[in-house]
From Swiss-Prot:
Protein name as catalogued: Ras-related protein Rab-33
Lineage: Eukaryota, Metazoa, Ecdysozoa, Nematoda, Chromadorea
Disulfide bonds: none
Motif (Effector region): 129-137
Family: Belongs to the small GTPase superfamily. Rab family.
Species, as recorded: Caenorhabditis elegans
Gene3D superfamilies to which the protein is assigned, alphabetical: P-loop containing nucleotide triphosphate hydrolases (3.40.50.300)
UniProt cross-references to Pfam families, sorted A to Z: Ras (PF00071)
Any single biological process term in GO: Rab protein signal transduction
Alphabetical UniProt keywords: Cell membrane, GTP-binding, Lipoprotein, Membrane, Nucleotide-binding, Prenylation
Length: 307
């Protein structure tokens, strides 16, 4: 018996696959913004499968970056006022009762008496200097040990013809004496003995309660016949005075000039038996000073017409 073989074709199947991406959650910054991606399209069975993740056809809006807060402008720097001098009194602080001290500056003409007082009271060297006629003075207030002190520097003429008519008023109620000489002028140093005798004649002796100091000015000037420091120190020791050498012209010596007068002011502040001028006395001295300067001006004009 013969066998019959029947070939049965294999069954064919059609498979349709649908790939769905998982949902993605995106936070929206505005109500009208999209929060999810659109659904992907089904893939054709004959199309090759892409192993890379599906990219949504519709773009998804992302939140806008938040701008940093604006940086506030830097505060404007406060412009500082003019530099105050050392130990200048403050207007917001209360001090003890103010005292006024009268300090006279004596010495030959052109030794720098006016320049020294200008440097201490005004903090600079005068641009133009002229010979002093009669008497002039400058003031400055300083705070020493919480006490407000006012110092008056009386500058007198070095010429003999002007000095004779003012000595009676010039040496009255004096609290301290400053002798000045020019280190480049030996004559001004030799005449210091005459100035000391004149002070002693009016009661300002070396062993009194009125302090005295000696200042050698113009130490910045080169000179062959210069008064040596040793010679000046010996003279100061014999007359019970402290010696200082400085220059009123040099800006680098400004602190030195400052310390000289502040040292004297410290000594005045610590000394107890001392006459301190009242307001009425200061007003009277101011009137006398104006009268003296007017009289000296008239005398100069009269001398100009002499034959």
């Amino acid at each position: 018996m013969s066998e019959h073989h029947v070939n049965i074709p294999a069954p064919q199947f059609s498979t349709y696959a649908t790939v769905i991406d998982p949902p993605k959650h995106v936070t929206a910054t505005h109500p009208d913004e999209l929060t999810t991606a659109s659904h992907p399209q089904p893939t054709h069975p004959s199309a090759p499968q892409d192993p890379s993740p599906a990219v949504p056809s519709t773009p998804v809006r992302v939140p806008y970056p938040t701008a940093p807060p604006p940086i506030p402008p830097a505060p404007e720097a406060v412009t500082a006022g003019p530099k105050k001098m050392a130990l200048a009194p403050s207007s917001t602080k209360t001090y003890k009762q103010k005292r006024t001290f009268k300090v006279i500056i004596v010495g030959n003409a052109a030794v720098g008496k006016t320049c020294l007082s200008f440097r201490f009271c005004c903090g600079r060297f005068p641009e133009h200097t002229e010979a002093t006629i009669g008497v002039d003075f400058r003031e400055r207030s300083c705070v020493i040990e919480n006490e407000l002190l006012r110092v008056q520097l009386w500058d007198t003429a070095g010429q003999e013809r002007y000095r004779q008519s003012i000595v009676a008023h010039y040496y009255r109620n004096v609290n301290a004496v400053v002798f000045v000489y020019d280190v480049t002028c030996r004559e001004s140093f030799n005449d210091l003995a005459l100035w000391i005798k004149e002070c002693e004649k009016h009661g300002l002796v070396g062993d009194s309660e009125v302090p005295r100091i000696l200042i050698g000015n113009k130490c910045d000037v080169e000179c062959t016949n210069r008064v040596s420091t040793d010679e000046a120190q010996m003279f100061a020791d014999r007359n019970n005075m402290a010696l200082f050498e400085t220059s009123a012209k040099l800006a680098s010596e400004a602190d030195h000039v400052e310390s000289i007068f502040l040292t004297l002011l410290h000594k005045l502040q610590q000394s107890k038996p001392m006459h301190v001028q009242s307001q009425d006395e200061r007003h009277q001295k101011e009137q006398e000073r104006l009268i003296l300067k007017a009289n000296e001006t008239e005398n100069v004009e009269e001398e100009g017409f002499c034959c």
